[in-house]
From Swiss-Prot:
It comes from Mesorhizobium japonicum (strain LMG 29417 / CECT 9101 / MAFF 303099). GO terms for molecular function: ATP binding; ATP hydrolysis activity; magnesium ion binding; P-type potassium transmembrane transporter activity. The active site is at residue 306. HAMAP family: KdpB (MF_00285). The system is composed of three essential subunits: KdpA, KdpB and KdpC. Part of the high-affinity ATP-driven potassium transport (or Kdp) system, which catalyzes the hydrolysis of ATP coupled with the electrogenic transport of potassium into the cytoplasm. This subunit is responsible for energy coupling to the transport system and for the release of the potassium ions to the cytoplasm. ATP binds at residues 343, 347, 376-383, 394. It catalyses: K(+)(out) + ATP + H2O = K(+)(in) + ADP + phosphate + H(+). It is found in: Cell inner membrane. This is Potassium-transporting ATPase ATP-binding subunit. Keywords: ATP-binding, Cell inner membrane, Cell membrane, Ion transport, Magnesium, Membrane, Metal-binding, Nucleotide-binding, Phosphoprotein, Potassium, Potassium transport, Translocase, Transmembrane, Transmembrane helix, Transport. Mg(2+) binds at residues 526, 530. CDD domains: P-type_ATPase_K (cd02078). The gene is kdpB.
Length: 697
């Protein structure tokens, strides 16, 4: 994957197979998927048949007709070539992924004893099987870690050489078939049968086997078909005008007029643009499950961003212990450390380290203490330990206060007095206003104080949000922090809004509320609790390090598990829509120059006054093309060559700029609208001069 990210737009390894692919795509069943080019192929075949008739009978201008036929077929082949190049880039990526898919032997476990396993082919594994994967082993299929912790090399999938940690019981429990365990061991429950793994899906999607036309593509195809029908009718009426004028226009000339006027440029490149949009995401190490998801990213109105890891660096560290009145710092530190002994989060580990550094409190063995760890959940927003009838909890201030109130009522114990609660709230507010996160700590219903966690806003993130605002995108920060902390960080980062103390249900409600207003929403997530929101969002980006449920729910997967990529994904989506719109504008604008090339050539000999060699319609020959035949031939040659010239742009995409919609429209109309008029005038004139100089017409 990493090699492919930097490959050239027109790589020789892709171009050569694409030449053969262009001819294979002449199959009518393949051409029928592109209505415009299918019509071009039909009229090319018709003209070829008429040429053979004239060749046998000796009628017509065989030399001129043959040149028109050659360039008509080149038009079809160039369109096929553009699609074949785009598909070839996907196939090259798929070949790279296939190298990661190796036949492996799996250590199938029948019971709890790790030493008793049976070696079986990885392809024979069924969903629900439990396998042992030890250091040096290849993980045989997708699964969920049910026991153990290990360092895993996922370079075959992500292209990232740094190993990652996979462990049971958290949001880092999902493992991917084809990756390798570097150290320790894990027990894995298989979640995908052979042929249906994440790697298989990646290969299928990257190759384009599952690519379907998006709604925008279908709508544009309908427009192009409509325009084609209009030009069919317009062309069909011309022989009547010619007959009325006492002249004759050959079928070859009518076909040339028809092909140059219909939107062949965008018709030829439309499929390549769609494939290239997904390809650009893959090169960015993001896998889109459909072209619809890429398009939706370009139309996003609201962006939901997790605070931790996206807006901030995500490594919150404990910096201070702030006890309430009547409690010593050491007592607070001891309780906070005890509640964090089994907490493997960066925050939990930093509390243990800070307690040791400040007060020499050493970590204690949970097994010796006979302690039961209470893990953090999105619902309780607390964690802690229970030891011999005693409990210690740390977490969000409101959650800890609610827990203390509930536990004292249940045990008929004395509730904390109002002064202590006010003191705790004052400390928490002070921490929150400084941009920190307050963690309240209690022991057996007694409030002890607050641990100050400090995070840092990423550099340059404020400018990124300003760019999104120019695009018309509203940014919302999602955080579990209290409203004061959230407000301080939101102001520092420059987001438009925030949702504090957010639960998975809150995220889902926010997405539905935005969608009810007609907005398209994008978000990212990695946990099982994010799955409903990922499924509901128009663009749901699941982290590759996340759970199986999250990856199944999202319509994109970020192989690098970098939440900040959501911003780039939106930009890639907008670039796809801009490329399609810009080339459509360019294609339609081309017709103006082609009109001034072919119409005068067709009617130059009509309505000729006595003593004149040309008629009044010759005045439309503003390009001063040499002869009617050279004018028609030049237009048909330009029509074919412009497809080849625009292939790199269709694959690379039009660069998106973070400016207002009005300014962006004006700029694109100037570049691709006016440019679409000027370029054909210049191109057709140059080709006409070359055709005349070579004596081709």
């Amino acid at each position: 994957m990493s090699q492919l990210k930097s490959s050239a737009i027109m790589d020789a390894r892709i171009l050569w197979p694409a030449f053969g692919g262009a001819f294979r795509k002449l199959d009518p069943r393949t051409l029928a998927r592109n209505p415009v080019m299918f019509v071009v192929a039909i009229v090319s075949a018709l003209t070829s048949v008429l040429f053979l008739r004239d060749l046998i009978t000796g009628g017509g201008d065989l030399r001129f007709t043959l040149q028109i036929i050659i360039w008509l077929w080149f038009t079809v082949l160039f369109a096929n070539f553009a699609e074949a190049v785009a598909e070839g880039r996907g196939k090259a990526q798929a070949d790279s992924l296939r190298k990661a898919r190796t036949e492996t032997q799996a250590k199938l476990l029948a019971g709890e004893d790790r030493s008793k396993f049976k070696l079986v082919p990885g392809t024979s594994l069924k969903v629900g099987d439990i396998v042992l994967v030890e250091a040096g082993d290849i993980i045989p299929s997708d699964g969920e870690v049910v026991e153990g912790v290990a360092s895993v090399n996922e370079a075959a999938i992500t292209g990232e050489s740094a190993p990652v940690i996979r462990e049971s019981g958290g949001d880092r429990s999902a493992v991917t078939g084809g990756t390798q365990v570097l150290s320790d061991w894990i027990r894995v429950r298989i979640t995908a049968a052979a042929g249906h793994t994440f790697l298989d899906r990646m290969i299928s999607l990257v190759e384009g086997a599952e690519r379907q036309k998006t709604p925008n593509e279908i709508a544009l195809n309908i427009l192009l078909v409509g325009m084609t029908l209009i030009f069919v009718l317009a062309t069909a009426t011309i022989p009547s005008f010619a007959s009325y004028s006492g002249g004759y226009i050959s079928v070859t000339v009518l076909v040339a007029l028809f092909v140059t006027l219909i939107p062949t440029t965008i018709g030829a490149l439309l499929s390549a643009i769609g494939i290239a949009g997904m390809d650009r995401l893959v090169r960015f190490n993001v896998l889109a499950m459909s072209g619809r998801a890429v398009e939706a990213a370009g139309d996003v109105d609201t962006l939901l961003l997790d605070k931790t890891g996206t807006i901030t660096l995500g490594n919150r560290q404990a910096t201070d212990f702030r006890p309430v009145k009547g409690v010593t710092e050491q007592e607070l530190a001891d309780a906070a450390q005890l509640a964090s002994l089994a907490d493997e989060t960066p925050e939990g580990r930093s509390i243990v380290v800070l307690a040791k550094e400040k007060y020499g409190i050493r970590a204690r063995d949970m097994a010796t203490l006979h302690a039961t760890f209470v893990p953090f959940t999105a619902q309780t927003r607390m964690s802690g330990v229970d030891i011999d009838g005693s409990s210690v909890r740390k977490g969000a201030v409101d959650s800890v206060l609610a827990h203390v109130n509930q536990s004292t009522v249940a045990s008929h114990a004395t509730r904390p007095n109002s002064d202590t609660i006010r003191d705790l709230q004052a400390i928490a507010d002070e921490v929150a206003k400084s941009g920190g996160t307050p963690l309240a700590v209690e022991r057996d219903g007694r409030l002890l104080g607050v641990v100050h966690l400090k995070d840092i806003v990423k550099g340059g993130i404020r400018e990124r949000f300003a760019e999104l605002r120019k695009m018309g995108i509203r940014t919302v920060m999602i955080t579990g922090d209290n409203p004061m902390t959230a407000a301080a960080i939101a102001a520092e980062a420059g987001v438009d809004d925030f949702l504090a103390q957010a639960t998975p249900e809150d995220k889902l409600k926010l997405i539905r509320d935005e969608q009810a207003k007609g907005k398209l929403v994008a978000m990212c997530g990695d946990g099982t609790n994010d799955a409903p929101a990922l499924a509901q969002a128009d663009v749901g980006v699941a982290m590759n390090t996340g759970t199986v449920a999250a990856r199944e729910a999202g319509n994109m997967v970020d192989l690098d598990s970098d939440p900040t990529k959501l911003i780039e994904i939106v930009e890639i989506g907008k670039a796809l829509l801009m490329t399609r719109g810009s080339l459509t504008t360019f294609s339609i604008a081309n017709d103006v120059a082609k009109y001034f090339a072919i119409i005068p050539a067709m009617f130059a000999v009509f309505y000729v006054a006595p003593g004149q060699s040309t008629g009044p319609l010759q005045a439309l020959n503003i390009m001063h093309l040499a002869t009617p035949q050279s004018a028609i031939l030049s237009a048909i040659i330009f029509n074919a060559l412009i497809i080849i010239a625009l292939i790199p742009l269709s694959l690379r995409g039009v660069k998106y700029r973070a400016i207002g919609a009005g300014a962006l429209l004006s700029r694109n109309l100037l570049v691709y609208g006016l440019g679409g008029i000027i370029v054909p005038f210049v191109g057709i004139k140059i080709i006409d001069m070359a055709v005349t100089a070579l004596g081709l017409a």
